[in-house]
Amino acid sequence: MPFKAYPTEKRAQERVRPHRWEVRKSTHGKEIDEALVGNHRRDSALRNDPLQDHLTPHLAKNPFSCKSPPVDTQLLVADFEDWRETVTEAVALLEQGEVVALPTETVYGLAACAFNAEAVAKIFKVKERPSFDPLIVHIGRKSDLEKVAVVPEEIRELVDELIEAHWPGALTLVLPKHEDIPDLVTSGLPTVAVRLSAHEIMREVAKVHGPIAAPSANRYGRISPTSAQAVMDELGGRIPLIIDGGACRDGLESTIIAPTMTEKGPVLRLLRPGPVSKEDLRLIAKVERVRNKPGATVEAPGQMASHYAPATPLMIVTKPGEFVPEEGKKYGLLTYRGSGGACLIDLTDWTATQTLSPGKGKLSEAAVRLFYCLRQLDAAGVDLIVAEPVANTGVGVAIMDRLKRAAAAHP
């Protein structure tokens, strides 16, 4: 069944729209502009990046700095009745070693050829991403898995079952990497994260061009983009092309698992919760949640303690009395159904309010709206975003994971 594109709140009025953005400072070296990075303390992460040697030789050839002229970013609206032009435009740039923003069913991705280390280096530069945080490789068909990964015989049946159940879809598998995949893609790890997207455009581009590395199309640590306009706000002037494929269907980054075989049988190590829930995965094998300890090796994207964060501090309020408003401060409220929750009911003077699932209380709708609502509150000029928790079940586990990491950005 064809992927359904959901309309964005602000569709482009023209098929191609240029955008220019003034770059003020180096985006990967030590000169991190706090206004650009949202005060997420990423400068220290970059200074202490143990895998910087993987990145430096490639960055030196195409430095992105204050001396670099801004790029004319084109916003190309996909024609879902005939998207050959869309695919052709994206593939042509990828073959030139450029990066492009592409829609997926989860969030928009920033794509580059997975086998071209110099092109992959541009992803890290544009996103201001430390090289110890690995990327996800997107393939265009199931059979392409063997081009980027090696499936051990002991888990082949398990992997086949996962692929049959959840590909194309929002499930990423961490497997031993193929020798052709550059170390930069995997942050020097012997494993690679792979998925087959359910979005026609991402999948078709990967079919025509070949496997592509594509993390979320935003600056590192910030809110993931679920619309083309959000990508433009984040990366306009830094990349040549954004494909507008509508709002993302799932709204949260993919679930990441590492299939393994133990003495007691197959186990799915859950590295990042996402749209494919723990309950879904348990139908196939035992699931073990992996919680990264401080200083531990990052095994997959999205494991940093601070991530997915607005520039505005965020606080999750779970009990009455946890939040006491200060006079003269402006507050934004992120509610689940719209009531504000029992602990917040007495505080009604909110500068801005966003509701994840108005009146319905549906976790699936809350997941789709999460990043949009956070962006709206972040732009509202408040001093603090107060977030109400959601049920820690199904996709609610992934929602709470994102909120906790967003809150950790401003301890």
Region spans (language model):
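Alpha-helix boundary/capping motif
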Residues: 7, 14, 31-34, 40-41, ...
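Serine residues within intrinsically disordered or low-complexity segments
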Residues: 18, 26, 44, 65-68
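N-terminal polybasic/positive-inside topogenic patches
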Residues: 42-50, 56
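Active-site-adjacent structural elements in enzyme catalytic cores
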Residues: 58, 63-411
